From Swiss-Prot:
Cofactors: [4Fe-4S] cluster; S-adenosyl-L-methionine; Mg(2+)
Protein name in the entry: 7-carboxy-7-deazaguanine synthase
Oligomeric and partner information: Homodimer.
Binding note for cofactor: Binds 1 [4Fe-4S] cluster. The cluster is coordinated with 3 cysteines and an exchangeable S-adenosyl-L-methionine. Binds 1 S-adenosyl-L-methionine per subunit.
Catalytic activity: 6-carboxy-5,6,7,8-tetrahydropterin + H(+) = 7-carboxy-7-deazaguanine + NH4(+)
Keywords noted in UniProt: 4Fe-4S, Iron, Iron-sulfur, Lyase, Magnesium, Metal-binding, Queuosine biosynthesis, S-adenosyl-L-methionine
Sites where the protein binds S-adenosyl-L-methionine: 94, 136-138
Binding residues annotated for [4Fe-4S] cluster, in chain numbering: 31, 35, 38
Provenance organism: Buchnera aphidicola subsp. Schizaphis graminum (strain Sg)
Example of a GO biological process term: queuosine biosynthetic process
Protein family according to the UniProt entry: Belongs to the radical SAM superfamily. 7-carboxy-7-deazaguanine synthase family.
Residue span(s) of domain Radical SAM core: 18-219
């Protein structure tokens, strides 16, 4: 299977449960969610005029709308050519679950990688059983119950106090599932949002995710 790849790079995971973990990011093109505050708007559309060769994907220095169709063998080849040492792989987007991720996650596991998918939960999740699912629900799009139940952690973006109402409605749907890993993440390092997240995390015994890669000014 071929996937529309926007970029592949090695860095440190800056969000959620795996914060601080050396990771290889595989960013897929295409997203129907369109959050106003999204910091990867260049992944929204999969326009033919933006398609380039996969060799050029390797050379990308800056994030942009350019993408390339790549199969799993080509993706693994790039990782080996680059001699990247991280063993944790983050499949993100865009919305990666627009695509069937079963093949890519299984093949990467055969190469001794641990896979993580970052998803809004608006699409069916198709991946290996061992893949770690980071669910990031969005108020403007319905979150599938199957996605909520499959998730290993919920990483919820917060801008104002009212945003927490939607999270509470989601948690009610899975009241029979013990979900210890709930992260609140202030949007765009907004100070008011940060204070809301800190106070709520303390009250609820949830966790705080602050996107450390942005503070460290790394990719």
């Amino acid at each position: 299977m071929y996937y529309p790849i926007n970029e592949i790079f090695q860095t440190i995971q800056g969000e959620g449960y795996y914060t601080g973990t050396p990771s290889i990011f595989i960013r897929l093109q295409g997203c129907p969610v369109h959050c106003k505050w999204c910091d990867t708007k260049y992944t929204w559309k999969c326009n033919n005029e933006d398609q380039i060769s996969y060799e050029k994907i390797i050379m990308k220095k800056k994030s942009n709308r350019k993408w390339s169709y790549m199969n799993v063998k080509e993706i693994i080849l790039i990782i080996k050519i680059k001699k990247w040492t991280a063993k944790h792989i983050v499949i993100t987007g865009g919305e990666p679950c627009l695509y069937n991720l079963l093949e890519i996650t299984k093949e990467l596991e055969k190469e001794d990688y641990k896979c993580q998918i970052e998803t809004s939960g608006t699409e069916l999740i198709k991946c290996s059983l061992n893949t770690w699912i980071t669910l990031s629900p969005k108020i403007n799009k319905k979150t599938l119950k199957t996605s909520i139940l499959r998730s290993n952690e919920i990483k919820y973006p917060v801008l104002k106090k009212e945003d927490l109402f939607y999270l509470n409605s989601i948690l009610k749907k899975i009241k029979n599932k013990k979900h210890n890993l709930i992260f609140l993440q202030p949007i765009s390092q907004n100070e008011e949002a940060l204070n809301i997240c800190i106070k709520t995390c303390i009250i609820k015994n949830w966790r705080l995710s602050v996107q450390i890669h942005k503070y460290l000014k790394i990719r």
